[in-house]
Amino acid sequence: MAATASSLTIASSFSEPRTQIHSSRRLNLPLQYSIPYKVLRSRSRRLGLVVSSVSAPNVELRTGPDDLISTLLSKVANSDGGVTLSPEQHKEVAQVAGELQKYCVKEPVKNPLIFGDWEVVYCSRPTSPGGGYRSVIGRLFFKTKEMIQAIDAPDIVRNKVSINAFGFLDGDVSLTGKLKALDSEWVQVIFEPPEIKVGSLEFKYGFESEVKLRITYVDEKLRLGLGSKGSLFVFRRRQ
């Protein structure tokens, strides 16, 4: 269970260039007047006149981070954190996230935007946040209500998965950890043993756990994290 809860990835408290679509279409622009073929051929020979089509310069169509964020959130909406998405849909999410991370600020680990309360809206491995509770069997008995990560300055991380058991019993599984910056993008969090609350019952179990996360994007709305085993996490800031 410790490994379970610990998988709730942390886009640390301190947290892959621009989308450019090039137009290679060539436009044939009409001449303003016609030249008789014989005259044209004659002049071409004498003057080396070359008549060719004019190609338009490449035009950059840029998709900004706001558009990418909207697209990303629409792709993961109502997916139970990614559980209901098909393999193809997971690929689409990864592609959009890959474009968005090109806009990441430098040294996201040091950016104060990483602090605050975040909702885990997607994970490429849906069982990572919440562990066994979100496995195929676990979902038969436990419904995930929300997955929250709070990052408090300067170095405290709190993960909480709220669940409903058997349709009538509410509970929480939470982790509290200490955040450490490894470099400008990677952080490490060492968590205390998980704590579970079910009704009036509250207890700790298991052992300490550790996770490492690379912050690949952060702004006022969204944060992206990449786990050490390749799991992609999407965090949306809570209002």
From Swiss-Prot:
Keyword annotations of the record: Acetylation, Chloroplast, Plastid, Transit peptide
GO CC aspect terms: chloroplast; chloroplast envelope; chloroplast thylakoid; plastid; plastoglobule; thylakoid
Compartment list: Plastid, Chloroplast
Residues recorded as bearing N-acetylserine in the entry: 53
Main localization category: plastid
Keyword Hydrolase: no
InterPro entries in the record: PAP (IPR039633), PAP/fibrillin_dom (IPR006843)
Span of chain positions assigned to the transit peptide in the UniProt entry: 1-52
Record bears the keyword Transit peptide: yes
Family: Belongs to the PAP/fibrillin family.
Family annotation (PANTHER family): PLASTID-LIPID-ASSOCIATED PROTEIN 4, CHLOROPLASTIC-RELATED
Name of the featured protein: Probable plastid-lipid-associated protein 8, chloroplastic
Highest classification ranks of the organism: Eukaryota, Viridiplantae, Streptophyta, Embryophyta, Tracheophyta
